Regions:
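Interdomain "pre-motor" coupling segment immediately N-terminal to P-loop NTPase/helicase cores
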Residues: 16-71
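Walker A (P-loop) phosphate-binding loop of P-loop NTPases
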Residues: 114
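Hydrophobic anchor at the beta1->P-loop junction of P-loop NTPases
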Residues: 109-111
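Conserved lysine of the Walker
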Residues: 117
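N-terminal pre-Walker A segment at the start of P-loop NTPase domains
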Residues: 74-98
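Hydrophobic positions on the alpha1 helix immediately C-terminal to the Walker A/P-loop
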Residues: 120, 124
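Pre-Walker A (Motif I) flank of P-loop NTPase domains
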Residues: 102-107
Length: 252
């Protein structure tokens, strides 16, 4: 092996040790390009490190999106905005700046099924992941079951601390299934712990006056609504269902 190739292999070996993925995979071609174009040492080093940083940023975005556990990837750019309910159209521009995360505010998207609530929530979540925030998506029924299991296993405090690492938690489908007092109390505690510290997005098919049907406790219902809506964005997503319109169109 020539001295040149030995040097390339040593560069790659060092890059692997330092977890420099781009340098490890592209050292040879980058060095060849620098020699061919008579690139200065400082320009070569700057170019190489910039590409390493770009790769890490991109990998970080993909990793955060994967860890968020979205059921599918829906982007804000895919929304047919003129078909959203009026309140959703009016407030989306403010929400997509993600200032609500910086300000530790919540979002409640309330309206009948099929109007874009979950799409907006996931779209905001993916954008947050791409901007460096830690996000978790979970349906409310699954969340309550997880909380109840942790209580049975005496690990609730550990689970609450784990939830605290997330800048944004999306709690989808509140209202589709009611739960008992224990489940309501556990969910209330989680929401209270995040209040004014981290952001939460709730999607629900029920207006606030019907939330007692979920929690079966008027005092707890009032307390949860108070925690969620304090300094929050409440979006009225009542309107014609996207899915119903698509189904009717297919039947024509």
């Amino acid at each position: 092996m020539s001295e040149y190739k030995q040097t390339i292999e040593q560069v790659r070996k060092n890059a692997k040790t330092l977890f420099l993925g781009y340098v490890y995979g592209n050292a040879a071609i980058e060095i060849e390009n620098a020699l061919t174009t008579n690139m200065s040492n400082i320009d070569f080093l700057n170019n190489l490190l910039q590409k390493e940083c770009d790769l890490r940023l991109e990998n970080g975005k993909r990793a955060r999106i994967k860890k968020a556990n979205f059921p599918y990837q829906k982007y804000l750019a895919d929304l047919v905005r003129e078909s959203l309910p009026e309140d959703g159209q009016n407030k989306l521009k403010t929400l997509e700046t993600l200032e609500f995360i910086k300000e530790k505010q919540n979002i409640v998207l309330a309206g009948n099924p099929g109007t874009g609530k979950t799409h907006i929530a996931i779209g905001l979540g993916i954008k947050a992941c791409m901007e460096g925030y830690k996000v978790l998506f979970v349906t409310v029924p699954m969340l309550v079951n997880r909380l109840k299991e942790s209580k049975a296993n005496l690990t609730t405090s550990n689970l609450y601390r784990w939830f605290e690492i997330y800048d944004l938690i999306i709690m989808d489908e509140l209202g589709y299934i009611s739960f008992d007092k224990e489940g309501g109390e556990l969910l209330f505690t989680l929401i209270s712990l995040r209040a004014e510290k981290k952001s939460t997005i709730i999607t629900t098919n029920l207006s606030f006056d019907k939330w007692e049907e979920i929690f079966n406790d008027p005092i707890m219902t009032t307390a949860i609504i108070d925690r969620l809506t304090h300094k929050s964005h409440v979006i009225n997503m009542t309107g014609e269902s996207y899915r119903l319109k698509e189904t009717l169109w297919l039947k024509k």
